[in-house]
Regions:
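Structural recognition of an alpha-helix C-terminal capping motif at a helix-to-coil junction
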Residues: 31, 45-52, 66-77
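Sigma70-family region 2
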Residues: 11-12, 51-66, 85-86
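N-terminal module of bacterial RNA polymerase sigma factors
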Residues: 1-28, 35, 120, 137, ...
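Short, charged helix-capping/linker segments at alpha-helix termini
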Residues: 11-20, 30-49, 61, 163, ...
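C-terminal edge and immediately downstream basic/flexible tail or linker adjoining helix-turn-helix-like DNA-binding
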Residues: 9, 90-98, 131, 138, ...
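Arg/Lys-rich amphipathic alpha helix in sigma70-family domain 2
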Residues: 59-63, 76-94
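Acidic, proline/glycine-rich intrinsically disordered inter-domain spacer in sigma factors
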Residues: 100-134
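Helix-turn-helix DNA-binding module
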Residues: 4, 133-170
Length: 200
């Protein structure tokens, strides 16, 4: 059953249909929020808050076919509201790096990372994630968001544009400049980008 069909059932009074939407979207939104905030506990809380907001406002969604864009927009606004409330800078955990012209990474990313048996390899992975986290914090938030949505959520530029209320060209521009900025950071730090990706 499609999201649109579940939404129709929910709006007719079938609460279980919304539970089905949660089951379908919880993992994906959790990973989006986790990469935006970099904190697992906060990600869990804000994922729940996102669904609460969606539950209250689903009746106002004009086009059920745009449910994906709508949910990401709610999740992003929930994160931003949280950061304003906390009055602190957000951190990011992004464990990959791709050219914007390449195919987007699989959006279904595991909530927990694969266990690494080799202690040395595990330490290298932690160091790589830390470096990527710091690099992401050095670029503008608007660019980070587009990178997360495109590379890790698998959204199309049209969907990203809708969620952020910007043009498609602006979304592509932010993606390009964000990736370019990250490359410059790695060059400045004399970091082998390919090695970091391999170790993730």
């Amino acid at each position: 059953m499609s999201d649109a069909e579940l939404i129709e059932k929910f709006l007719k009074g079938d609460i279980s249909a919304f539970n089905s939407l949660i089951g379908r979207w919880e993992k994906r939104l959790y990973n989006f929020i986790l990469r935006y905030l970099g904190n697992r506990d906060e990600a869990k809380d804000l994922c729940q808050e996102t669904f609460i907001r969606a539950y209250r406002n689903l009746k106002f969604l004009r086009d059920p076919q745009k449910f994906s864009t709508w949910m990401h927009q709610i999740a992003l606004n929930t994160c931003r509201d949280h950061l304003k409330k906390c009055q602190r800078r957000n951190t990011f955990s992004l464990n990959g790096f791709h050219n914007p012209e390449e195919t987007a990474a699989n959006p279904e990313i595991e909530m927990e990372k694969t266990t690494v048996s080799d202690p040395d390899m595990a330490a290298q992975n932690r160091d790589a994630r830390e470096l990527l986290n710091k690099a992401l914090q050095s670029i503008p938030e608007e660019q980070r968001v587009v990178i997360i949505m495109k590379e890790y959520q698998g959204l199309k530029f049209t969907e990203i544009a809708g969620a952020l209320d910007i043009s498609v060209n602006t979304a592509k521009s932010r993606m390009y400049y964000g990736l370019s900025a990250l490359k410059k950071v790695f060059d400045q730090w004399d970091i082998d980008r390919e090695k970091i990706i391999y170790e993730m």
